[in-house]
């Protein structure tokens, strides 16, 4: 197979879209460079004194890891200077990040989780960067505003993630299928390794943190019992796999099928909708899932149809093989009837 780089792949698909501009390619190229810089630090984390926390707490009420802070800094610095974005939103920042007026502002908005699963770094488990790209809604002559960022998922121009593990992978979609690229350290390029990725219609793996069983409602318990029992449509139990790193769990689901679930629970009164953020986690992964032939819902609604009301809004997530997600939807609907 010819060794196709990310840039070559983008330029090829750009020719198929008359509305495409070089600005988007520039944005992706700067994201790729950021990924290489972050990947280098992740692989050397134990040698660079970047393990552990900073002692600070972010806007989510979570302890900030040193690598979280580093990845966030890298992405903001690089993307501010790309000339392709006008604003950004990060899981680590309370408010939107406007590109300074002294720098060129582009037409795009970038939303990202700089290092999902960063608490796993200390034990050498996969982590990842999740990103979502939108077009600004306001005229270029106006100042960028919150409404440019608070858009439903179906408005995404592109979305993807970078998985840092035994190999570093970039998986993304521009609305023309899902493609995966693996970083070849010998040439310093992401090369196309997984073209036209698709999720099997039904899987054999379910992924959820079952230790929260006592905090779930009855429909959620029924759903989990369906997948772990033998009275399902497969006629035998699904296998349980749960890493606790969203990107790693979703990547496995994308490749092998099945379902990843993070339902609402009653552990934390201040987080009744669960832990995952709509804009920087659920929405971009839902975009990928649908492009790969899967589904993503919050229990009743299609994730991509949900319009965010706040920057760090949380939402339950059921994502993966279409028929497995259909079953979740069916059980919740029966309990609501």
Curated annotation (Swiss-Prot):
Membrane-spanning parts: none
CDD domains assigned: FBPase
Domain of life: Bacteria
Cofactor(s) needed: Mg(2+)
Binding-site residues, Mg(2+) 2: 113, 116, 281
Residues reported to bind substrate: 116-119, 209, 242, 275
Pathway where this protein functions: Carbohydrate biosynthesis; gluconeogenesis
GO molecular function, one term: magnesium ion binding
Presence of keyword Repeat: no
Example of a GO biological process term: sucrose biosynthetic process
Chief site of localization: cytoplasm
Catalytic activity: beta-D-fructose 1,6-bisphosphate + H2O = beta-D-fructose 6-phosphate + phosphate
Co-factor note (free text): Binds 2 magnesium ions per subunit.
One Gene Ontology cellular component annotation held by this UniProt entry: cytosol
Database matches in InterPro entries: FBPase_C_dom, FBPase_class-1, FBPase_N, FBPtase
Entry-linked SUPFAM superfamilies: Carbohydrate phosphatase
Localization per record: Cytoplasm
Record-stated family: Belongs to the FBPase class 1 family.
Matches recorded under PANTHER family: FRUCTOSE-1,6-BISPHOSPHATASE-RELATED (PTHR11556), SEDOHEPTULOSE-1,7-BISPHOSPHATASE, CHLOROPLASTIC (PTHR11556:SF35)
Name the UniProt record assigns to this protein: Fructose-1,6-bisphosphatase class 1
Protein source organism: Nitratidesulfovibrio vulgaris (strain ATCC 29579 / DSM 644 / CCUG 34227 / NCIMB 8303 / VKM B-1760 / Hildenborough)
